[in-house]
Amino acid sequence: MAIILGIDPGSRVTGYGVIRQQGRHLSYLGSGCIRTKVDDLPNRLQRIYAGILEIITQFQPDAFAIEQVFMAKNADSALKLGQARGVAILAAVNQSIPVFEYAARQVKQTVVGTGAAEKSQVQHMVRSVLKLSANPQSDAADALAIAITHCHFNQNLLRVGDPRLILARGRLR
């Protein structure tokens, strides 16, 4: 059993999602958004850090999964996103939680089946996979999708160690 905290970083809205993995079974524990209303960046970053620490304290995750930086058209936005990611990762590392990073296209491919999926498709699939009664908020759905992706890859890593697998010519058979 493992508890995974997924983070969709942002300098104004940071989504989070927490799920429990028991073998192949995933269960929803919580999700939401850390909203920063303060205009100056240092205080926004402090709010993100404090918010993530609060979530870590509440759920005690075993793993921290976060979206990788993508190249934005606006350099200023990309820098702010990188800083938000940095404080989020710092919160996890300071609590000795292992950090895993996943590209946005990889998350969409894993959860929806296509790396070009729309946000509404991600929300729908997260709702379906976790058996939720309603679609989660967009940023929270993205964070839950990141956590689901981590579970998928973590499960595959566990299977690679399975002695029943035969490795031949560079392929799993």
From Swiss-Prot:
Record keywords, A-Z: Cytoplasm, DNA damage, DNA recombination, DNA repair, DNA-binding, Endonuclease, Hydrolase, Magnesium, Metal-binding, Nuclease
Necessary cofactors: Mg(2+)
Assembly: Homodimer which binds Holliday junction (HJ) DNA. The HJ becomes 2-fold symmetrical on binding to RuvC with unstacked arms; it has a different conformation from HJ DNA in complex with RuvA. In the full resolvosome a probable DNA-RuvA(4)-RuvB(12)-RuvC(2) complex forms which resolves the HJ.
Binding of Mg(2+) 1, residues: D8, D139
Protein name: Crossover junction endodeoxyribonuclease RuvC
One Pfam family recorded for the sequence: RuvC
GO molecular function, one term: magnesium ion binding
Residues at the active site: D8, E67, D139
Superkingdom of the source species: Bacteria
Gene: ruvC
Cofactor: record remark: Binds 2 Mg(2+) ion per subunit.
Family: Belongs to the RuvC family.
Compartments where located: Cytoplasm
Catalytic activity: Endonucleolytic cleavage at a junction such as a reciprocal single-stranded crossover between two homologous DNA duplexes (Holliday junction)
InterPro entries: RNaseH-like_sf, RNaseH_sf, X-over_junc_endoDNase_Mg_BS, X-over_junc_endoDNase_RuvC
Binding annotation for Mg(2+) 2: E67
A single GO cellular-component term on record: Holliday junction resolvase complex
EC numbers: 3.1.21.10
Species name: Photorhabdus laumondii subsp. laumondii (strain DSM 15139 / CIP 105565 / TT01) (Photorhabdus luminescens subsp. laumondii)
Role noted for this protein: The RuvA-RuvB-RuvC complex processes Holliday junction (HJ) DNA during genetic recombination and DNA repair. Endonuclease that resolves HJ intermediates. Cleaves cruciform DNA by making single-stranded nicks across the HJ at symmetrical positions within the homologous arms, yielding a 5'-phosphate and a 3'-hydroxyl group; requires a central core of homology in the junction. The consensus cleavage sequence is 5'-(A/T)TT(C/G)-3'. Cleavage occurs on the 3'-side of the TT dinucleotide at the point of strand exchange.
BP-aspect Gene Ontology terms: DNA recombination; DNA repair
